[in-house]
From Swiss-Prot:
Gene3D superfamilies xref list: Bira Bifunctional Protein, Domain 2 (3.30.930.10)
Organism: Roseobacter denitrificans (strain ATCC 33942 / OCh 114) (Erythrobacter sp. (strain OCh 114))
Annotated Mg(2+) binding sites: E257
A GO-annotated cellular component: cytoplasm
Family classification: Belongs to the class-II aminoacyl-tRNA synthetase family. Phe-tRNA synthetase alpha subunit type 1 subfamily.
PANTHER family given in the database record: PHENYLALANINE--TRNA LIGASE, MITOCHONDRIAL, PHENYLALANYL-TRNA SYNTHETASE
Name by which UniProt lists this protein: Phenylalanine--tRNA ligase alpha subunit
Length: 357
């Protein structure tokens, strides 16, 4: 019995793999193994012999099975160690790069404009893109015969046959937001109104849908001098040019009186626009003192309050600042264009941290 025990325990200890270990198990404790054959011989023994041999064989079988299990676990651990050595991963290596999206220039410039005017105390106001012609035209002192109300310039919403109510329009500017905010908040007031607007025009510098930001400030003693200061501060911060020169030219808008178009100093060198230098001028926005009729339409007494307003194209000033040649490309959804002109998602513009890259 001891010889049999030593034989198989030594074979188990010397086994190199699970296949060899299984062969030893079958030879030792399998149905036709040596221990099983010894068990069958118990029937030929006397009772006294069986009382001695039976427990010894069971103990041998248990010991061999324990040795087999321990060896199998050891082989599995060794195989795992070998696999880990062969397939190890250096966790200090940089991760594989993931495709990253970019912030559209319109979104970025909107955030830049909001940050600048936010430092001056302006809050953001928003309103519907589909509005009544009263908010879009009448409340802004734009009469029925004005060219802007023609179907060739404005997108009108059709009504069901027999519905005689005034038509809705896709707003042609964000000025209706000013009227709604005056109605809701009264005076004093200091807001900017960024958002999408719609006009029936399409060429290199015009698209049927584009983006505007308009500003409105109403108080007791506001004047054109305040308007001039606000716009010059904005241009200096937005274009990041100290002392940028501006020029106010008399103009006419139905909703402001007096009205002025505002130009900024620029030059053209080898076909490249340079802002803040040279002897040329570039128109960038319209502005003026809010017309008394517009204040009255917003529920504000023009004898007690006055204010200034201005408006500019977000897409246009984005083109000027970042050298984008064609407005239509803003809406083409071209990933190559977006990767080139887009901004990192964490580029949050602030006056103190920097507006642009």
């Amino acid at each position: 019995m001891d010889d049999l025990k030593q034989k198989y325990l030594s074979q188990i200890a010397a086994a190199q793999d699970e296949a060899g270990l299984e062969a030893i198990r079958l030879a030792a404790v399998g149905k036709k193994g040596e221990v099983a054959l010894k068990m069958r011989e118990l029937g030929k023994m006397t009772p006294e012999e069986r009382q001695v041999a039976g427990p010894a064989l069971n103990a041998l079988k248990d010991e061999i099975n324990s040795a087999l299990a321990a060896k199998k676990a050891g082989l599995a651990d060794a195989a795992l160690d070998a696999r880990l050595r062969d397939e190890w991963l250096d966790v200090t290596l940089p991760a594989r790069g993931r495709p990253r999206g970019t912030i559209h220039p319109v979104s970025q410039v909107t955030e830049e404009v909001t940050a600048i005017f936010g430092e001056m105390g302006f809050s953001v106001a928003e309103g519907p893109r589909i509005d009544t012609d009263w908010y879009n035209f009448d409340a802004l002192n734009i009469p029925g015969h004005h060219p802007a109300r023609a179907e060739m310039d404005t997108f009108y919403m059709t009504r069901a046959e027999g519905d005689d109510r005034p038509p809705h329009v896709l707003r042609t500017h964000t000025s209706p937001v000013q009227i709604r905010t005056m109605e809701a908040q009264g005076a004093p007031l200091r807001i900017i109104c960024p958002g999408g607007v719609y006009r029936a025009d399409y060429d290199q510098t015009h698209t049927p849908m584009f983006h505007q930001v308009e500003g409105l400030a109403i108080d007791k003693d506001i004047s054109m001098a305040n308007l001039k200061w606000v716009l010059e501060e904005f241009f200096a911060a937005f274009f990041e040019i100290d002392g940028i020169k501006t020029r106010f030219r008399a103009s006419h808008f139905p909703f402001t009186e007096p009205s002025a178009e505002v130009d900024i100093q620029c030059s053209w060198i080898d076909g490249q626009l340079r802002i803040g230098e040279g002897d040329d001028w570039l128109e960038v926005l319209g502005s003026g003192m809010v017309h008394p009729k517009v204040l009255a339409a917003g529920g504000i007494d023009p004898d007690q309050w006055q204010g200034f307003a201005f408006g500019m194209g977000i897409d246009r000033i984005a083109m000027l600042k970042y050298g984008i040649p064609d407005l239509r490309a803003f809406f083409d959804s071209d990933l190559r264009w977006l990767r080139h002109y887009g901004f990192a998602s964490l580029d949050q513009p602030t006056l103190h941290g920097g507006l642009s890259r």
